Design a protein with these regions (language model features):
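A generic fold-level signal
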Residues: 1, 39, 48, 108-111, ...
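Acidic, metal-coordinating catalytic segment for phosphate/diphosphate chemistry
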Residues: 1-43
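A short linear hydrophobic-aromatic micro-motif
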Residues: 15, 55, 98-102
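Short connector loops at helix/strand junctions that flank enzyme active sites
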Residues: 22, 37-41, 63, 68, ...
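Unchanged
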Residues: 73-97, 102-154
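Charged phosphate-binding loop/patch that engages nucleotide di/tri-phosphates or the phosphate backbone
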Residues: 154-169
Length: 169
């Protein structure tokens, strides 16, 4: 989010030098800098003991491609807590082991994605109202259902990391 008006008093902000950060929106009334902000999100590739991957169809995201579990972090929540919560909310599954897979910038939506591989026991899904459908798919089938592999697509980054892991690299 790029601030144009002060969220506290509503006055139009002016650019002011803020040390090494350069010009930053500033409120002369409140005497506060308002640095640009962005959302922190999680994305989780959910994998079961048979190396099947949970693929979600969410029509508000795409009618053509499927995705992994993802969602916004809430204030006071760690990325790990958000990842476990999102898997429970969207699929009704308990994460047994969570493996951190780095952070990735999603420029299109100005979001910082905290990526994880979440290991679960294979169970039937209990879907959230946000999810139209979900399926366990084979490791080999998953990339065919994903969004195209382009810069910023965390799905493929996670998939490649998991591929390296199971191939012992």
């Amino acid at each position: 989010m790029r601030y144009k008006y002060c969220p506290e008093c509503g006055i139009k902000l002016t650019d002011r030098q803020a040390g090494d950060d350069g010009l930053v929106p500033y409120c002369n009334e409140c005497q506060m800098y308002w640095f640009n902000t962005f959302a922190s999100c999680v994305i989780v590739m959910v994998v079961n003991e048979f190396q099947e991957i949970a693929m979600l169809h969410q029509s508000y995201i795409s009618d053509e491609f499927e995705t992994f579990v993802a969602g916004f972090m809430t204030p006071g929540e760690t990325a790990e807590q958000a990842a476990v919560r999102e898997v429970k909310e969207e699929l009704g599954l308990e994460v047994e082991h969570l493996e951190y897979a780095g952070t990735h910038w999603f420029a299109k939506r100005e979001q910082l994605m905290h990526a994880f591989i979440g290991y679960v026991k294979k169970r039937d899904f209990v879907l959230s109202t946000e999810v139209n459908d979900a399926n366990w798919v084979t490791f080999e089938e998953a990339p065919k259902r994903m969004f195209p592999d382009r810069p910023g697509n965390t799905q493929h980054i996670l998939y490649r990391q998991y591929t390296a892991h199971i191939n012992g690299k």
